[in-house]
């Protein structure tokens, strides 16, 4: 069965309306669910739909005047599987999407759980403006804004996103990199990106824009012993760790760093940088060149500057003056 006609004239025809139905397949405002229980009721000047299934649990309030009103979604949980309906995202016209206000306590897309989600949109010419988009977990926060337009049949999406994570390893695990050889690392990122496609078509391999990165105090894991570790052992910057008998950054965990930062230009499936900088207790490392996001290849120059000047005073104390 198909329910239609929820518009301005429906108020006169449905002063009282209450319907419970079990559906094998539900698609409502782009949200799909299998084997869902749907309750539709008339409340004052709104329609209220309550949805319950394995992947969705919550309520949608739909105003009579979709052109000027706001559709409100309050969900306990929502899990979206890409292309689960087999529909082509390019067939969606963002200019026909009503104003939205969404609050979802537990949001997942595919196997990616992003915690609580808040989205607020307004209508613009040929599309929608995403005025607010936020994802919140205890160790990860993402916030930003953007827009989605369709002109002459071509989708155009543009977003600016800020990401904050208390632990880089936990963030990478959230995004599916559970075997990332890194630990700790307070992370800040800013992504300004544009791509031809819908917001659901986003991937780093198909966007143009910029990515700014800053990571503080982390460790690369499972590195083999190298001469660089000796400088790390002797570095003045890590002397407080040594006095506390803390050698975990050298032996137990791998190679530690104090800061990593850099700026990338994203273009045609590649990321370009001339200032990716890592400062560690044993060396400064600068990387410039290209990373192939889609082709998984590299064309880079890596410059390593050992922290000899910072390490020699400690070395002198331990091994005697130079030349002795």
PLM region descriptions:
Residues 2-14, 89-94:
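N-terminal leader/targeting segments and the immediate start of mature chains
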Residues 16-29, 39, 48-57, 63-113, ...:
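Small-residue helix/turn framework positions
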Residues 43-45:
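A short, compositionally biased
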